[in-house]
Amino acid sequence: MDHPRHSSPQGGAFAFLKTLPFLTGAVATLIVNAGGQIVAKDAITAPAVSLSPTASGDMDSSVKPGDDFYRYANGGWLAKSVLPAVQTSYDTRAMLKEKASGQVRDLIQAAATAPSEKGGLAQKVGDYYASFMDEASIEAKGFTPLADEMATIAAINNKTSLSAYLGTTLNSEVDGLTANSDHVLGLWVNQGFEDSEHNLPHLWQGGLGLPDRDNYIDPSPQDVELRAKYQAHIAAVLKLAGFADSETRAAHILALETSMARAFAPDSDAADVFKQNNPWKRADFDAKAPGMDWESYFKSAGLARQPDFIVWQPSAVTGISALVEIDNLNQWKDYLRFHLVEHYASALPRAVSAEAQRAQNRAQAAVDATNGALPQAVGQLYAQLYFPPAAKARAEEMVGDLIKAFRARIANLTWLSPLSKEKALAKLAALEIGIGYPDKWIDYSSLDIVRDDAFGNVRRTEAFNRQRNLARLRQPVNPIDWPINPQIPGAVLMFSPNAEFFSAAILQPPYFDGRGDAASNYGSAGAGIAHEISHSFDELGNIYDAHGRLGTWWSDEDLLQFRAKSGKQAVQLDAYCPFTDLCVKGKQVLSESVADLAGLLVAHDAYVLSLKGKAEVMLGGLNGEQRFFLAFAQRWRKVQSEAALRRQIAGDTHLPGEYRSDAVRNVDAWYNAYNVVAGDKLFVPPEERIRIW
């Protein structure tokens, strides 16, 4: 699962793959009732992927569990899962993304096609979607919606007016999950690294049109070609918007962005929280980043009275500010014109949205726009349909067992000093875990959504989100502000604050079934949740205290002991060689593999706690212990091309799924459950099993 800490990769598009055998579940017909609530007209069928694995034929009972547990658990599924040529890999997580994508599409389109209460969530969601589907209205308006802002850009005549305009673009589009902003700086409101009581504005570098700073400065043929294509794209957009000399303007824009990129911090700095923690007072901007008229900038940004900031990449702020000082107003104005059109391309005529590659599928583009603009409105409707209160309660009960189990594990550790144990237990007690969806939703009642005004809807929504985030600067820190939306399959660990979140869309079969087998739930979703919990207490989690503040709480001896024990696991991982010429690099995947094992151990303890001394139930010829480990192995199944597997081994911090399932070989209970003995290929002598948590 994802735990971006303070930086994260951008999410990819949902794949749509009908050919895999488990995509057979029926979808409910959705309607909007008289109260404006989306409901299922037909009963939703049981999930296509059963958590009672023996019924599906996914296993291969001809394989001995102790020799190859992954193929014992998944051999049947692997045999019938053919990877289409257009895909490089496919797994259960991808299936959940597909499923959620279809569910979100259906509920948004249902909201758009049925009468609903004015001002209700269904009306806002449906009308936002409808406005993007109203191509006639969008084409008729042309570029008129941009006229006022284009006039403002044209009127920029000095550093002060340029700085003031740049301040208006400081929006809240970056956060713990989204590291990129298409504006010169990005804003995230969150607690400070050393202050858990006050929300602060975190400023991030932004404003580049290409994905990475290296795309601008790397001399490789691929980046040279990419820059040429980007310059041609800039020219095409400007020409469509009616600007003469578009090729010359495009060259100037690329030159400006290249100068900005040279000041950007490299991506490698994102992994070093101490490089991100740069508290600046308001006066520091004038002293450390001269050039920008910061008084005008922050006044326009709504931050005139804000005394404290966190600057994540000081070199970028200093470099961009210096570029404002240079006499290049026309270059800046062309840059702002291009990015204005680019930013709103999806709400502009088709010629522009097509050039911006946002019009391949109008309906899907409208769904994506709606989901992005009104995430918690869509999320609330999604939760009503697909994650009922009973499922949330059952998942929360499981989390309670996981916390009890982890508490006992910490108390019994031999390598952690007594003082560090005390701090670990305090951190565990303070850990906030959000399940499914927020207890308090964003209130959209003041936001007007108009059915025939796509551009206006975007602008009003951006203003709404900006004001909502600025208001948080005057509010106490809320550790359970959700960084992920219910309809997005995923899990997020936020070290600061000390909180973790698991969306409704990830807590679906086959990971979790609110009506399904407890042993399977604990072995799959339980192990995943415990995996994330363990990261709060590992070598990286050790630098954040119970309140999410920076501060190491391990002793030097604790660190040495942890590294000695985890080093043994790295050696075990080094032995995994899917190809004769390529083996896993144990150190590269160590952190995630330690968490996999910790999650499995804690989840097993929690499953035992859930039984409350009662006898296990037999299902499909398997007892609870067997189903627990089977579910763990089945969550890692994946079909993958050789090239994709080689790329994963070369650069990913996670083991290939086949080897992630082999964490069972370090768990004593697995040996008992499947009668694994010396001579079996996965057998590890008890004294050599990895024992960290």
Question: Model-predicted segments: where are they?
Answer:
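N-terminal secretory signal peptides that target proteins for export/translocation
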Residues: 1-17
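Gram-negative bacterial Sec-dependent N-terminal signal peptides
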Residues: 12, 16-35
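Short, Gly/Pro- and small/polar-rich lid/capping loops
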Residues: 42-57
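Intrinsically disordered, low-complexity linker/terminal regions across diverse proteins
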Residues: 47, 259, 288-291, 314, ...
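Active-site-surrounding "flap" and adjacent substrate/cofactor-binding loops of secreted or lumenal enzymes
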Residues: 47-48, 61-137
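Hydrophobic/aromatic-rich, well-ordered segments within soluble, folded domains that form packed cores
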Residues: 59-79, 216-239, 590, 600-602
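Short, solvent-exposed loop/turn elements at domain surfaces
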Residues: 77-81, 210-211, 510
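Noncatalytic, helix-rich "gating/capping" subdomain that lines the substrate-entry/channel surface
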Residues: 111-401
